[in-house]
Amino acid sequence: MATIPEVPASELIQTMPRVGMGTAAFPFTSSEDTTAAMLRAIELGYRHFDTARIYATEGCVGEAVAEAVRRGLIASRADVFVTSKIWCSDLHAGRVVPAARETLRNLGMDYVDLLLVHWPVSLTPGNYDFPFPKEVILPSFDMEGVWRGMEECHRLGLARAIGVSNFSAKKLEQLLSLAAVRPAVNQVEVNPMWQQRTLREVCRREGVQLCGYSPLGAKGTPWGSAAVMDSGVLQEIAGAKGKTLAQICLRWLYEQGDVLLVKTYNEKRMKENLDIFNWELTDEERERISQLPQLRGLPGLEFISDHGPYKSVEDLWDGDV
């Protein structure tokens, strides 16, 4: 069983495994398959699981953790790190705490280790299929009111740490200026083809842990891109090193100091994704990766609307590269 390095504990967050298992899948995977994959991941050494209300996988993660305890794979729920997120339809000052309680009911847990604001966008309260109709996007996002709700989740012990997802550097700095409890994490798309240089600099300066999703570009998903897996440079580096292209990408994120989220239910790839800790990229390889052309795979077009807070992709991301 692999041992995964952890981000050291700080005043904002307890120790956090540097590699986590993601559970986002559209179309949705059956709950039985998801739960079985989570159990196998625990057997292989994964201890960090990322879920969200909108993924419809909170129950699967909770069932897998409970079954792992029953089987003796882990001693208790405390042996895993669980992240979930408040979806946009609940990103209203008075709805954050009730939404967090619903997440805990879904998980069958008393707390999550990390609770995130999923996107800096509010939708009309209700349940919508994804993608949602544009008319439910509200014209403004009450960042301060939402964050006060997140802070209350932290105060009540519903979440051991709180953070954000899909926040640009500018929005993160805006949040930091008003937060009583600082965000511990910003979870965003990160891979060699979208390196997040501006945001990473801000996160390092402010002590916010960067957590990367889609580290391989999420090829084959509605939101992903083939640019990473089709990169000739990454293929050459992988061939010369005797590693898979995926391992090159994951090692690159690891060397940046990021927490990274992988998503596969294939056991062989689960194992390969953990074989990134006992070797390094060379300076030349890092330099070649730094020169790769940049392409955002997830622009967030679903949140762009003439009557919403973001009229363009530039508005949503504030020019981050």
Swiss-Prot record:
The keyword Secreted does not apply. Substrate binds at H118. The record marks K85 as: Lowers pKa of active site Tyr. One of its GO terms (molecular function) is aldose reductase (NADPH) activity. Keywords: NAD, NADP, Oxidoreductase. Expressed in roots and leaf sheaths. This is Probable NAD(P)H-dependent oxidoreductase 1. It comes from Oryza sativa subsp. japonica.
